Amino acid sequence: MTAMTELFYRDPYVREFTSKVISCVEGEKGFEVMLEDTAFYPEGGGQPADHGTIDGAAVFDVRRTPAGIVHYCEKAFDVGQDVKGVLDWERRFDNMQNHTGEHVFSGIVNARFGFDNVGFHMDDDVITCDFSGVMTEEQVAEVERACNEAIVANVEVGISFPDAEALEKLAYRSKKALKGDVRIVDVPGCDRCACCGVHVRSTGEIGLIKVLSSMKHRGGTRV
């Protein structure tokens, strides 16, 4: 992780920023632009990439590579050029709401029924979560009610980077051996989980969690 250049971790509510171009090459998907600093979140952790503009030119994908974060852009820039980045904030905030909502839902499922989230997909309209055990419609409705009670409570979402000793002692959902810095997202009373995504400040900002459907899927439940 190169947190010094990742503005979305310093403050996920940054909508505009200025930076300097450090690399720009033409690729198969347009121009691949790297910046000294960026607020554009790269696809990862189940969360879609941010969209927006760099100096008015569309950014239509963002990916993390071994070299750093690459912005796929419709226009070329000169190395050393100062530029202004602007996020598609509606898309970003929607993704933040959805991702935190997924944590709340998955955490409550795990706490009440012991099932793990074994699959997670976010798109523009719907989120799907696959759980490792079968839940009845009544149980899914129970989880939905508990989630919305947590939203009304407006619980603050905490972010921390425990050291190795503290991490070993810490209880969190889906715990497994991880290398490097481990970022813990904590929603008190609902969930604690390692996650690289960006989240809202408090559960009240999620707005509402509504289950559209649930079904048996590969020996478990898809919601």
What does each model-identified segment do?
Residues 1-222:
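A glycine- and charged-residue-rich anion-binding loop/surface
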